[in-house]
A protein has these predicted regions:
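Conserved AMP-binding/adenylation subdomain of ANL enzymes
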Residues: 1-3, 11-51, 65
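Gly/Ser/Thr-rich phosphate-binding loop
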Residues: 24, 49-54, 63-127, 141
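AMP-binding/adenylate-forming catalytic core of the ANL superfamily
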Residues: 52, 159-161, 172, 177-264, ...
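Active-site glycine-centered loops adjacent to acidic/histidine catalytic or metal-binding residues
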Residues: 82, 106, 134, 178, ...
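Adenylate-forming AMP-binding core of the ANL superfamily, especially NRPS adenylation
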Residues: 84, 117, 123-167, 171
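Beta-strand->loop->alpha-helix junctions that form or flank phosphate-binding loops
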Residues: 102-109, 134-136, 226-228, 270
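AMP-binding/adenylate-forming catalytic domain of the ANL superfamily
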Residues: 261-282, 300-304
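Acidic/polar alpha-helix N-cap and adjacent early helical turns
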Residues: 290-304
Length: 304
């Protein structure tokens, strides 16, 4: 199976799982302290892995680099998890490097992954089910329920519950805070987090929808969206954005107006040099909230 490259930190289930998997399989691996493009590329060139795993932020770093296709010629598949990855970014990576991207769904409380794409499923279904995080892993079970626990039917949106295969056949259903839908073929779409919904004057704003719209702008390297208390509306969305190319808040707002409802547009967009991130590569939402809490409220309302 070749050498594995582990670039997820060992404080995260992704890094721990990969290392333990390699040890169990007597498989050699390279352990990087963190993802850094030059170090990762050097490891790929030297060890020529057939499969690599990248978190979305790392995948976008590779995608928007000048790394030539020849440097990744050994790689046959990229797996991607820990945070949402847009279908557009997955397709752009495949178009640029000729490598399919297999997204997955996992959490520390599950002891690892519970759903994901196989290469066979990707070849057969990706065009019609793009954006899904795949189907339940062997031994795992997933369902969508209403708030009272009533199971919902195919394509109905509700709370995702999981029986992880890692916990054995007698495991009970674990309720997540993720909103999801599952189609008749068992493919899962994560549509947001119930505990992160922003209620703006009675209107529900899903931060992941706003983040995805911001990250669809070609100048945006990454974005994070959180709620800020508002004395009149209760709370409003605000956004922090890291750029890869020059742009302005006005340009970003115009981009959002073409994709979102007025109430979904952040009341403030802060452009920063780099998004704060957790060791696993996710945006550090607590740090983002702290940033906006320390700033005076900007009077300009982009939603108007």
């Amino acid at each position: 199976r070749g050498v594995a490259i582990v670039n997820s930190p060992l404080v995260h289930i992704g890094g721990v799982f990969r290392v333990l998997q390699c040890v169990a399989e007597a498989r050699p691996f390279v352990l990087l302290e963190r993802f850094e493009l030059n170090a990762w590329t050097a490891a790929v060139r030297r060890h020529r892995p057939r499969a690599v795993s990248l978190v979305p932020a790392a995948l976008r770093t590779v995608l928007h680099s000048d790394l030539p296709r020849a440097d990744l010629e050994s790689i046959q598949v990229v797996t991607c998890g820990t945070a949402p990855l847009s279908a557009d970014d997955a397709d752009a990576f495949t178009e640029k490097y000729g490598i399919p991207v297999l997204t997955s769904y996992a959490a520390t409380e599950f002891g690892g992954g519970v759903a994901g794409w196989t290469l066979a499923d990707h070849r057969r279904y990706w065009r019609v089910k793009r954006g899904s995080v795949g189907r339940a892993n062997p031994g795992a079970a997933l369902r969508v329920v209403a708030e009272d626990g009533t199971p919902l039917g195919p394509d109905e949106i509700g709370l995702l519950e999981v029986k992880p295969g890692q916990l054995g056949p007698d495991a009970g259903w674990l309720r997540t805070t993720d909103m999801a839908r599952i189609d008749a073929d068992g493919f899962v779409w994560i549509v947001g987090r119930a505990d992160q919904a922003i209620i703006r004057g009675g209107f529900k704003v899903m931060p992941d929808d706003v983040r995805a719209a911001l990250e669809s702008h070609p100048a945006v390297a990454g974005a994070a969206v959180v709620a800020r208390p508002d004395p009149r509306l209760g709370e409003t969305p605000v956004a922090m954005v890291e750029l890869r190319a020059p742009s302005t808040t006005d340009a970003l707002v115009q981009h959002l107006r073409e994709r979102l409802a007025r109430y979904e547009i952040p009341t403030e967009i802060a452009i920063v040099d780099a998004l704060p991130r957790t060791p696993s590569g996710k945006a550090d939402l607590a740090a983002v909230r702290g940033y906006f809490a320390e700033r005076p409220t900007v009077l300009r309302n982009h939603a108007r």
